[in-house]
Structure formats: structure tokens, C-alpha cells
């Protein structure tokens, strides 16, 4: 779904229809396009990682607009397709490994768990570092998984 937003293109403000495929909004606090409660912090950006390493909360740039129409990543991204993950990752061994690291797991089948295995995703911490370096969004806090439910 596209959203009508104001963006500066070649020095002129224009109303643009923005469709973010594989991305989410990441506006600065001074953009004039976010809730007043986020004017001091910038727009919250939730970046899920995987069930083993964790996720991040980021915020839009401190000031101004990033070079991606106020957009940022919205996840670590897959390194393996679901099919590849099911073929190469042992769901029972994965469950044991995650539980041994203190993460409680509830999954309907081991195959379902394999699809979402940490090895099936890119390194979320590296994605966050690159997102920050690119000026798309700023890291605020890293969250650690405690419980995973996969249906």
C-alpha cells in the first residue's frame, strides 16, 4: 500500500506516493510527518532478527531526511529460503540448542522451527551496523529473545 508523503527531490518539496517493499518508515523528529510524541526521538523502527539472536529498536535520523525517502530496513533478511532451511537444518537439534541457551520454544513441528532458524537469516547486528552507517536509522536498544512460539 502506498502512502502519500512530502519529500524533497532536487531541492523542491513534492507530494509523493511511497510504497515500501521490504522497508519501513524511518523519519526524523523534525520531519513534520510523525506523531508529536516522537519529535524528540525520531520515528521508532522495529527490526526483528531471528529467534536465537534477538531484535532491535531503532529510531529515524536525528534531523533531516535520509537518502532513502525516510525508509529503513524492517528485518535482517533471509539467508536461506524456507525450503533450503527445512532441508539443511535439523529442527530437533535446533530446539535443543535454543533451549540450552535459555530460550523457551513452542513449535507445532520441528520442520516449522527449521524455517525460522537463526542460520536461515542474515546477521541482524551486521544489518543494524550498516543501517546506522548509511544514516537510515539509529540503533536504540537490542532485545534478547526469551520465548519463541512458532505455529
What are these regions (language model features)?
Residues 1-151:
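Domain-length cofactor-binding catalytic modules of enzymes
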